[in-house]
Amino acid sequence: KADYALTGNFSTIAYKEAKKYGEVRCAYDGSSLQFSHIPSQDELCLHSDASYFHYCANNTIYGTEWNYIPETNGVVLVSDMSSDITSRVVDISKYGLIYAGAQKNMAPAGVTIVIIQKDLVMKPLDCTPLMLDYQTMIQKDSMYNTPPCWCIYMLGLTMDWLENKGGVEAM
C-alpha cells in the first residue's frame, strides 16, 4: 500500500504508474483546484499502514513547490526532486528514496539520480522492469547496461562547478 499526493502533472503520472504494482491511495488530490495549491500537513490523508508516501517536491507546470517536508510518522518518505534537487539543501536522512531526472537542472536528459536507504533495496516484484531493479543497479555499480557517458560527464562537470562555488549552501 502506498499514499500519493497529487499536486501536479508528474505526481499524477507517478500515481497512475504505481497502480500497476499495488494498492495506491490518494493522500491529497489538487486537481479540483487546477493544482494551484500545495497541501498543508493537516490536509494530507496519510495512512499508518502505507509502505511509503510519495510526493513531487516541485511542480514546474503549475508553479507550486512544497516548502516543508511532510511528517509521515514513520512511513517511508519518497520524493521526485527532478526540478529542485540542487535549489536548496536537502536533509536526505528524512527520506527513504529520492529520485531526480537530471535534465531539469543538473545535466542533459538521460541520467536519473537515485538516493535510496540500503534497507529499502530488496527483491523486486517479478513484473518490475530490470532497468528499475535497484538491487541489480547497485550490484553492477549503475552500469548494468551502457550508461549515457556524455550525460554523466556533463553531470560531473556541473557538480564540480557547484562544489567550486561553495555547494548548494552558497548558491
For the regions a language model picked out, list residue spans one by one:
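Structural motif
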Residues: D3, Y52-C56, V78, Y99, ...
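Conserved PLP-anchoring active-site segment centered on the Schiff-base-forming lysine
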Residues: K1-T12
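Short acidic/polar capping segments at secondary-structure boundaries
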Residues: N9-F10, D29-L33, A57-Y62, S82-I85, ...
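Active-site C-terminal subdomain of aminotransferase-like
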Residues: A102-M171
